[in-house]
């Protein structure tokens, strides 16, 4: 049975990390994807992923026409080709560590139409050093025996809310609702603003979605994914 999910991965020439990301996904979430879209920010050949992901029904392997085009333009290009109601967004440097994150995330999005996306990182990973607290609220919520936590509301200069390009399930309809991720940036900073600043894109869209009454959720404190690309950052 189809879950109506397309996985979109942004990749930037780190094929060893991409392979590890996909192997761990296939281990913990087989038979959950209708399609895998990988948008590569350069000329690399990613056809090897078809052997890593045998349960995926369809592959769409894109290569940016310009090397180092930037994450946001590539995301919007990939999203324009999504045909399913849900997107599991991911980057090329994560390791999934536990099962059922797709099913649990999907359940939360189905139950709560105002939930924008579901975080999978540990609560410790989402720590704000400047405030000595996590982005995740302390109160545990339970729905149908599934525990979840809400991400703190966005406050200017305080972070929180949680819209992110980190791994997480979200709806294609919510992306279209705001006219794409670049639209809030253009409204605030002008159409010619440098859209390669991923953190600014996340913050601006966080504020924008919160004004629409949406919130983000997180699964259990120990998390179900870990970042493996800390020392392999690609500058924009």
Briefly describe each language-model feature range.
Residues 1-23:
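N-proximal low-complexity "stem/linker" segments adjacent to membrane-targeting elements
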Residues 20, 160-236:
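C-terminal catalytic/acceptor-binding lobe
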Residues 23-33:
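Short, acidic, metal-binding catalytic loop of nucleotide-sugar glycosyltransferases
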Residues 38-49:
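A conserved acidic beta->alpha catalytic loop
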Residues 65-81:
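Glycine-rich, basic loop-to-helix element that forms the pyrophosphate-binding segment
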Residues 87:
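Short aromatic/hydrophobic "clamp" motif used to bind/position activated sugar donors
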Residues 99-120:
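Conserved donor-nucleotide/metal-binding helix-loop-beta segment in metal-dependent transferases, i.e.
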Residues 116-134:
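Short beta-strand-to-loop element that shapes/binds the nucleotide-sugar donor at the catalytic cleft/hinge
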